[in-house]
Amino acid sequence: MIYLAEGCFWGVEEYFSQVDGVLDAVSGYANGRGDTTNYQLIHQTGHAETVEVTYDANRISLKELLLHFFRIIDPTSLNKQGNDRGSQYRTGIYYTDKADLAIIDEVFKEKAKDYKKKIVVEKAPLKHFIKAEEYHQDYLKKNPNGYCHIDINQATYPVIDESKYPKPSATEIKAKLSADEYRVTQKNETEKAFSNRYWDSFDAGIYVDVVTGEPLFSSKDKFESGCGWPSFSRPISPDVVRYKEDKSFNMTRTEVRSRSGNSHLGHVFTDGPKDQGGLRYCINSLSITFIPKADMEAKGYGYLLSSVE
């Protein structure tokens, strides 16, 4: 088990109940003053709204759970998540097994690189966990339109561990890439439309960063847009891309870059299929490498097969 405080527990409980490998998620109160409290008293007793997550370690690792944790919080916000304010809404990771601390520290170290501000998430042994009142359990299942400060739909996206796909040195990148790949990924240039390798390819598989191998897109989300470049309705996971305002060529666009490699990928536009979210990720073929579904297991991407099927 691991105990996660991430603001209002209604959405957090529902989110983790949808994560593959999680066996149970229970709302409660943790690490306050004393081993008794209730919803009306937690602002006085110092407890944090917390979810007890029971998981199958053969299906999901603690690190993967913690990456889910960081996906849905602002770790630099003290005593505030979403619209909720107060010490009961602080973020925290509370553990019962000392061996978990090394994994928690590893994730903290990795995530600290993503933020300019200091991470203020508590990490501490669990002192006590008090199960919340019954009306709080499965709250959003009982009240589908109830308040929720997080995007629960993100629970279905795979968690991709950035540390598995480190960025090579500048020298290594230059040696690895072709001249055209280097020009596009490192110099932010654009390849020609309708004459690139993936614009009209729709075989089953995934597309990874040509620099790092980090998974970026799935063939399941690829569509024919008529623009002459590979087009996707979404990334394989919201975690693997970064966005940047691009004002080149007297236009204002949103550039898409890869997370680990910081490679220029292309741009995202709002003229995509409405039934798939309305976005069009227009991506340079030179920025990505296709991994056929049949090769995914052998190349270490077997954990993403469900994102293709």
Swiss-Prot record:
Free-text function comment from the UniProt entry: Has an important function as a repair enzyme for proteins that have been inactivated by oxidation. Catalyzes the reversible oxidation-reduction of methionine sulfoxide in proteins to methionine.
Keyword field contains Isomerase: no
Q: Which SUPFAM superfamilies match?
A: Mss4-like (SSF51316), Peptide methionine sulfoxide reductase (SSF55068)
Q: What is this protein called?
A: Peptide methionine sulfoxide reductase MsrA/MsrB
UniProtKB keywords: Multifunctional enzyme, Oxidoreductase
Matching entries from PROSITE patterns are given as: MSRB
> MF terms per GO, please?
L-methionine:thioredoxin-disulfide S-oxidoreductase activity; peptide-methionine (R)-S-oxide reductase activity; peptide-methionine (S)-S-oxide reductase activity
What is a single Pfam family found in this protein's UniProt entry?
A: SelR
Per the database record, which ranges form the MsrB domain?
170-293
**Region (Peptide methionine sulfoxide reductase A), start-end ranges:** 1-153
Q: Which family does it belong to?
A: In the N-terminal section; belongs to the MsrA Met sulfoxide reductase family.
Q: Provide one Gene Ontology cellular component.
A: cytoplasm
Provide a GO biological process annotation. protein repair
Span-the-membrane segments of this chain are none
PANTHER family per UniProt: METHIONINE SULFOXIDE REDUCTASE (PTHR10173), PEPTIDE METHIONINE SULFOXIDE REDUCTASE MSRA_MSRB (PTHR10173:SF59)
- Active site (catalytic residues): 8, 282
What's the EC number here?
Answer: 1.8.4.11, 1.8.4.12
Reaction(s) the record says it catalyses: L-methionyl-[protein] + [thioredoxin]-disulfide + H2O = L-methionyl-(S)-S-oxide-[protein] + [thioredoxin]-dithiol; [thioredoxin]-disulfide + L-methionine + H2O = L-methionine (S)-S-oxide + [thioredoxin]-dithiol; L-methionyl-[protein] + [thioredoxin]-disulfide + H2O = L-methionyl-(R)-S-oxide-[protein] + [thioredoxin]-dithiol
